[in-house]
Design a protein with these regions (language model features):
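Flexible, low-complexity junctional segments that flank or bridge functional domains
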Residues: 1-319
């Protein structure tokens, strides 16, 4: 537990310096590499005092011009959300020296432009994260790079997600909860699952993992959830050569299972990865059915709670 708390603090300090430290935000250091170098030093420490000492020594390696005067924030009605920097004032946790170092960085003179974030007019003010190494040759398990990806994401949302104030859960607690999940990754599938679980915490369907297999197959029907059931409600328009496939499913059919797994079970299994429940339901049912020709669906037509007919079908309709 102490190691998780130490790594969480490292995440916060590293991200804070990435976006606030004048030299770091200017791209003068390989900031990923600096994280990977310091990370082992934050494990198995005897006390938080020793942890804070290690972090102070690390921070002091990156010099900058200190600002004289009292720090103040610009008060404006146009500011909806300010970054949460209260944690750097917590001397009971950070100690006086570390807290003072972080406040000096907060108050430092720095250029408006950042090497890592583009907020230009061409992007309509949206944050575009630049100069982030992809590490495409990374294999799993690799704890250092697994944590790097989590730290990148957590801090990007910490400082640039405009709807962070709407999150119902404490963002610091979310970090503590997800570090163990990223430490347990043993494969690429585990890695993608951990990312999906983390992304789901912000409840925004614009966020997700993109890429992967293309959609080669299509179920030629519209599936909607009605009273908690996956119900076929209408058809898609098909090319003439596929017209005979149209009769496989009928409006009113209820999808019960996919690959022998009950729909309710599928939804329960993937809910932790859902950043939007309606979209999750679609992706859980319609997309898996359509992804390839080997999917099997068992359906039944229900009218007034009476089962009229059952179907055992394998979709092989190619787009």
């Amino acid at each position: 537990h102490a190691d998780v708390e130490n790594l969480a603090l490292l995440c916060k300090v590293w991200g804070f310096m990435k976006y606030y430290h004048p030299s770091v935000r200017a791209g003068e250091y390989d900031w990923d590499r600096e994280l990977l170098c310091i990370m082992p030093s934050l494990v198995s420490l005897p006390s938080k005092e020793k942890r804070n000492e290690v972090l102070v020594k690390w921070i002091d390696q990156f010099d900058f011009k200190k600002k004289n005067g009292i720090y103040s924030l610009c008060a404006s009605d146009s500011i909806k959300l300010l970054p949460d920097l209260d944690w750097i004032e917590d001397k009971s946790n950070l100690g006086t020296i570390l807290s003072d170092r972080l406040k000096e960085i907060r108050d430092a003179e720095r250029d408006t432009a950042s090497y890592y974030v583009n907020l230009g007019v061409i992007n309509m003010g949206n944050a575009v994260f630049e100069h982030e190494e992809r590490y495409s040759k990374c294999t799993f398990p690799n704890i250092d790079y697994q944590l790097l990806s989590l730290f990148r994401l957590w801090n990007a949302i910490q400082y640039y997600f405009p709807y962070k104030y709407l999150l119902k859960d404490n963002w610091n607690e979310i970090l503590l909860n997800h570090i163990p999940l990223f430490l347990e990754i043993t494969s690429r599938m585990d890695y993608e699952s951990a990312l999906k679980r983390f992304i789901a915490e912000i409840h925004d369907t614009h966020a997700g993992i993109y890429g992967g297999p293309t959609k080669k197959y299509l179920v030629p029907v519209v599936i909607r959830f009605i009273e908690g059931k996956a119900v076929v409600t209408e058809y898609y328009e098909l090319k003439s050569e596929f017209k005979e496939e149209k009769q496989i499913l009928q409006p009113g059919d209820v999808i019960l299972r996919i690959n022998s797994e009950a729909v309710d079970s599928i939804i329960k299994r993937i809910t932790p990865y859902a950043n939007n429940i309606p979209a999750m339901i679609y992706n859980a049912i319609a997309h898996p059915v359509a992804q390839n020709g080997g999917r099997i669906v068992i359906c039944k037509l229900v009218i007034s709670l009476l089962q009229i007919r059952s179907l055992f079908i394998a979709f092989t309709l190619k787009v």
